């Protein structure tokens, strides 16, 4: 039987409503897979204003990546979205390898950290940095359906692919019994030819600038794999990663590897971590692929406890370890039910007729619009229009974050 578009969307919407309205679900599997909130846990203590300013600024930078593949980002640093917020940035290049899970979009820019007046009259200044932003997906098909692929062995690249003949360095860390999601790894393989040569040149030109990797959704998983190659295979230091709504990239071995490479088990200075995995209340994507299949989240989580926009410093919690019950791992059962319903609905999506829009994606796959929690990271990410998503129109700067606010 062939479904009409409206029928398909109605069925899936009903599933979402049923999922989010259910308060309890017995999660099948071992007790290690059972995630429940800790009612006696203390309320989050919040984060500092400088760290909040850093995360908020990076969320706008990754939102700009959604202009790649649509209206574009042009030199010096122009786009129809939030580029005017960053007059100190200079675009180096942008790439777009295609629309599939194994493809990638993003841009490389240099932030010279010089305060200037933007079109709105506000001053914007950031610390000098080389910025690499990885776009997420426009399609829920990529986010949910394609997360079903089989993982494969993960081995960091032994040497850069810039044509040099020097032998690879002996890595300080080794990845033992690691597997990685095939689609994520292939996406990075397709991307590295556009990123690594540029980064090598920029490091020589700006040796004191840190490399800031930032990604949303599937772009977060690519940023993670890119960072591992830079840190382990190339031995580069001063690499900082910030992801928003990052899926689980691989198995427990890979999660442990990320923890070791970025020293994420050191809780003495959580705001000083070099890997920040930002998650959001009710966002199902950080829970995918499912733990039943052996996938595991790495540490470094920064949890936004407030569901609706806009959060404040007191709404954000610095999580401890890979599986902090006060963070996304302790999501109540309704979120786990939502996640499973979203995933198992893939049979309905793939069995339905393939009505495509001009960009090649079936209309029914645009269900990411229903997953606001996956898009609401300080701002509503994912739409390249003036001022960002219409949900953000009329919103000024976050209170307390003036042009002179120091960032971390």
Swiss-Prot record:
InterPro entries linked to this entry: AB_hydrolase_fold, AB_hydrolase_lip/est, Fungal_lipase-type
pH note: Optimum pH is 7.0.
Signal peptide (from-to): 1-24
GO biological process terms held by the UniProt record: lipid catabolic process
Keywords per UniProt: Glycoprotein, Hydrolase, Lipid degradation, Lipid metabolism, Metal-binding, Secreted, Signal
Glycosylated position list: 177
Protein name, UniProt field: Secreted mono- and diacylglycerol lipase 2
Gene: FGL2
């Amino acid at each position: 039987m062939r479904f009409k578009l409206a029928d398909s969307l109605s069925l899936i919407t009903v599933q979402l409503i049923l999922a989010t309205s259910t308060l309890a679900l017995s999660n099948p599997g071992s007790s290690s897979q059972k995630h429940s909130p800790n009612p006696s846990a203390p309320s989050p203590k919040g984060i500092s204003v400088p760290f909040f300013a850093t995360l908020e600024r990076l969320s706008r930078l990754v939102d700009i990546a959604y202009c790649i593949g649509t209206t574009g980002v042009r030199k010096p640093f122009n786009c129809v979205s939030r580029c005017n917020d960053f007059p100190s940035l200079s675009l180096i290049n942008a790439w777009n390898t295609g629309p599939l899970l194994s493809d990638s979009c993003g841009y490389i820019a240099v932030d010279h950290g010089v305060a200037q007046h933007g079109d709105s009259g506000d001053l914007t200044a950031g610390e000098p940095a080389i910025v690499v932003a990885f776009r997420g997906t426009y399609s829920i098909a990529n986010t949910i359906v394609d997360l079903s692929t089989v993982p494969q062995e993960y081995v960091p690249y032994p040497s850069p692919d810039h044509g040099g003949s020097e032998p690879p360095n002996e890595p300080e860390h080794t990845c033992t019994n690691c597997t990685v999601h095939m689609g994520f790894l292939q996406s990075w393989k397709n991307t590295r030819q556009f990123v690594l040569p540029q980064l090598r040149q920029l490091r020589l030109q700006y040796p004191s600038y840190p490399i800031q990797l930032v990604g949303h959704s599937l772009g977060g998983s690519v940023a993670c794999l890119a960072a591992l190659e830079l840190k382990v295979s190339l031995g580069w230091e001063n690499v900082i990663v910030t992801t928003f709504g990052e899926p689980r990239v691989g198995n427990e071995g890979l999660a442990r590897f990320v923890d070791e490479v970025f020293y994420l088990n050191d809780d003495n200075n959580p705001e000083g971590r070099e890997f920040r995995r930002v998650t959001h209340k009710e966002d199902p994507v950080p829970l995918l692929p499912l733990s039943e299949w052996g996938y595991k989240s790495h540490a470094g989580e920064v949890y936004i406890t407030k569901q609706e926009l806009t959060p404040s410093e007191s709404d954000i919690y610095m999580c401890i370890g890979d599986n902090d019950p006060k963070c996304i791992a302790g999501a109540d059962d309704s979120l786990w039910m939502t996640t499973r319903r979203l995933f198992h609905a893939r049979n309905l999506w793939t069995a339905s007729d393939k009505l495509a829009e001009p960009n090649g994606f079936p209309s029914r796959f645009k269900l990411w619009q229903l997953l606001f929690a996956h898009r609401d990271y300080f701002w509503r990410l994912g739409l390249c229009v003036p001022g960002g998503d219409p949900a953000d129109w009329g919103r000024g700067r976050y209170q307390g974050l003036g042009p002179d606010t120091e960032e971390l």
